[in-house]
From Swiss-Prot:
Annotated keywords: Cytoplasm, DNA damage, DNA excision, DNA repair, Excision nuclease, SOS response
Main location as per UniProt: cytoplasm
Transferase recorded as keyword: no
Subcellular location: Cytoplasm
Gene name of the record: uvrC
Record protein name field: UvrABC system protein C
Span of domain UVR: 208-243
The protein's role, per its UniProt record: The UvrABC repair system catalyzes the recognition and processing of DNA lesions. UvrC both incises the 5' and 3' sides of the lesion. The N-terminal half is responsible for the 3' incision and the C-terminal half is responsible for the 5' incision.
InterPro entries hit by this protein: GIY-YIG_endonuc (IPR000305), GIY-YIG_endonuc_sf (IPR035901), GIY-YIG_UvrC_Cho (IPR047296), Hlx-hairpin-Hlx_DNA-bd_motif (IPR003583), RuvA_2-like (IPR010994), UVR_dom (IPR001943), UVR_dom_sf (IPR036876), UvrABC_protein_C (IPR050066)
Organism: Legionella pneumophila subsp. pneumophila (strain Philadelphia 1 / ATCC 33152 / DSM 7513)
MF term (GO), any: DNA binding
Subunit annotation: Interacts with UvrB in an incision complex.
Domain of life: Bacteria
């Protein structure tokens, strides 16, 4: 044992540990989970933390805080890795490498419609719909660009099912040649299925297979004198070859994921390059948070690299076996590579190998990943040095003793009192935290009363934050002295004291750079120079709160107006309104619909259909 004085209970616990696979949770004196780990042999692994040979800075810092340890025995290492991954996502322990939630990374979803599947962007924590998923992609823009490419080449529909069912003529997507109008049966289910299969192969990187099949189908069309279909197939081949030329970084056979990692104090960068059929299909960067440690000690640097790699394996591959490739290539030796190969192969149902520092042609894949890794790290450091300098400037401006770790900002949006919505956005030292943004539908107030709206939103928000003990260091209100005073009163009534409250009003000209800051704690108002870093940070969070509020307000206003428009028609209640909207996809399409189409909606009589039609055609 090292020089740490273990309690008698903990020392006894270490001797009684089983020599079986499982996971362990290390807790501090308050019962907070500090670290979650997995082990093939719980007894050996947990005891190793308390060995004299374990001199890593991070390990010593962790061990000094451990008051108790909990274990869960599993049937296999695979089960242990899955459980570890799920617990890290749920508990987010201080000393684990933490990757961002899956919601941050969007997917492409192909629905399981029996005849005409839909392609769409999918990103949600909710239970995913059935169908095929591809991704994750580095961002929404990458998904949208890929979807547009698929629409141009394969003409897969992207409209909602309710809209699809309601069509009586082709929409604009057909006019611009991005859809074959399956809604009005301009294409048979059999031919549409061929397009969907080609789109799936395209997303899997199997371009050459598609090209061969398209060429064969084009020959058949020509031999049958079907020159129109042959021309369509010719254009598909041309577009695919163009993409193949743009996409191919290294033209080699095989499927692989190339993972390059760089660990720095406080963060790591993981560059994952997806290669299918010898072509680079995707390259994306992940930035997990890693525990701070002194990285000039070789042991700590290597240990954090290993943890980062294992955390990524759990995060990226274990939720879906379809993502596991034949080969994973990485740029540093892995202590448990054989164990990870076994786990991934079991999960996949066939072999998955891990290759370290490849030679020959595959080394070019690694070179590509490492080059992208360096660029990603440089961009991240540049961006976050700007963020840190802005946080430091705000700390100095507010004369705070401690660093600002978390800020929240509230804004109110409405149109002359209609559809009032409050927004709350969250920033931490990494910048915006969109997954923690919240909207509040404001009810029961006098329309247009911003003070009452702000009071309701802040009260609801802080009652919850007090329960979960997650209070911000700085609270920003997009408003003047009156709104800030209301918020101060709310915080006082809830017993919240240790928060810096700051108002940001637009000033007399309402121009950026002329904002007046209201510091309630010191009862003073002031204007910052336009080049102030603190002002830039406040403008950023204020603008984000405003954007989020106005987006929510517009959605609510549109929904309210649709409901009020339909319910003003005698005989149309909530159920019939829903049936109409599901059938036609929206108010605009309903307004254009002929009388005979409205009659087809379930629950709508001919007399009521006539009344609805006349409402839109007075």
């Amino acid at each position: 044992m090292n020089d740490l004085q273990l309690s008698a209970e903990l020392a006894l616990f270490l001797t009684k540990l089983p020599s079986e696979p499982g996971i362990y949770r290390m807790l501090d004196e308050e019962g907070t989970v500090l670290y979650v780990g997995k082990a093939a042999n719980l007894k050996k692994r947990v005891n190793s933390y308390f060995s004299k040979q374990n001199t890593g800075v991070k390990t010593r810092a962790l061990v000094s805080q451990i008051k108790s340890i909990e274990i869960s025995v599993t049937r296999s290492e695979t089960e242990a890795l899955l459980l570890e991954s799920n617990l890290i996502k749920a508990l987010r322990p201080k000393y684990n490498v933490l990757l961002r939630d899956d919601k941050s990374y969007p997917y492409i979803h192909l629905s399981n419609h029996p005849d005409f599947p839909r392609i769409e962007l999918y990103r949600s924590k909710k239970k995913p719909p059935s169908g095929n998923f591809f991704g994750p992609y580095p961002g929404v823009a990458a998904v949208r660009e890929t979807i547009v490419t698929i629409q141009k080449i394969f003409k897969i529909r992207n409209c909602r099912d309710s809209y699809f069912k309601a069509r009586s003529r082709p929409c604009l997507q057909y006019q611009i040649k991005r859809c074959t109008a399956p809604c009005v049966h301009y294409i048979s289910p059999e031919n549409y299925k061929l397009s969907v299969e080609d789109a799936i192969r395209f997303l899997q990187g199997k371009c050459q297979i598609i090209l061969d099949e398209l060429a064969e189908r084009m020959k058949q069309a020509v031999s049958q004198l079907n020159f129109e279909e042959a021309a369509v197939l010719r254009d598909q081949i041309k577009n695919l070859r163009l993409i193949q030329e743009q996409q191919g970084v290294v033209q080699l056979r095989g499927d692989a994921d190339v993972i390059a990692i760089e660990v720095r104090p406080g963060f790591a960068c993981i560059q994952c390059v997806t290669i299918r059929e010898g072509q680079v299909l995707n390259s994306q960067s992940f930035f997990p948070t890693v525990p701070y440690a002194v990285l000039d000690e070789e042991l700590d640097a290597n240990s954090l690299w290993q943890q980062t790699f294992e955390a990524f394996i759990g995060f990226y591959y274990l939720d879906t076996s379809e993502r596991i490739p034949d080969l994973i290539i990485t740029n540093q030796s892995i202590t448990e590579s054989r164990s990870l190969e076994y786990i991934l192969s079991q999960r996949r149902g066939k072999s998955c190998k891990i290759q370290i520092n490849p030679r020959g042609v595959k080394s070019r894949w690694m070179d590509f990943a490492v080059n992208n890794l360096r660029i990603s790290v440089a961009e991240y450091v540049s961006k976050h040095s700007t963020i840190r300098s802005r946080y430091q400037a705000l700390k100095q401006l507010l004369a705070l003793d401690k660093n600002i770790e978390r800020m929240e900002c509230f804004d109110i949006s409405h149109t002359q009192g209609e559809a009032t919505v409050a927004s709350c956005v969250v920033f931490d030292t990494e910048g915006p935290r969109p997954s923690e943004y919240r909207r509040f539908n404001i009810e029961g107030i006098t329309p247009g009363d911003d003070y009452a709206a702000m009071e309701q939103a802040v009260t609801r928000r802080f009652k919850r934050l007090i329960d979960v003990q997650l209070l911000p260091d700085v609270l920003i209100i997009d408003g003047g002295k009156g709104q800030v005073s209301i918020v101060k009163r709310v915080l006082t009534s809830l017993g919240v004291e240790d928060i810096t409250l700051l108002g940001v009003s637009k000033g007399p000209s309402r121009k950026a750079g002329w904002e007046k800051l209201i510091l309630v704690n010191e009862n003073r108002e002031f204007v910052l120079p336009e080049d102030s870093k603190a002002l830039h940070l406040l403008q950023h969070i204020r603008d984000e709160a405003h954007r989020f509020a106005i987006t929510a307000h517009r959605k609510k206003r549109q929904k309210t107006r649709v409901e009020s428009t339909l319910e003003s028609i005698e005989g149309v209640g909530a159920k019939r309104r829903q049936a109409l909207l599901q059938r036609f996809g929206g108010l605009r399409e309903l307004a254009k619909a002929p009388l005979e189409e409205i009659c087809k909606v379930q629950g709508i009589s001919e007399q009521l259909a006539k009344r609805i039609y006349e409402h839109f055609h007075p």
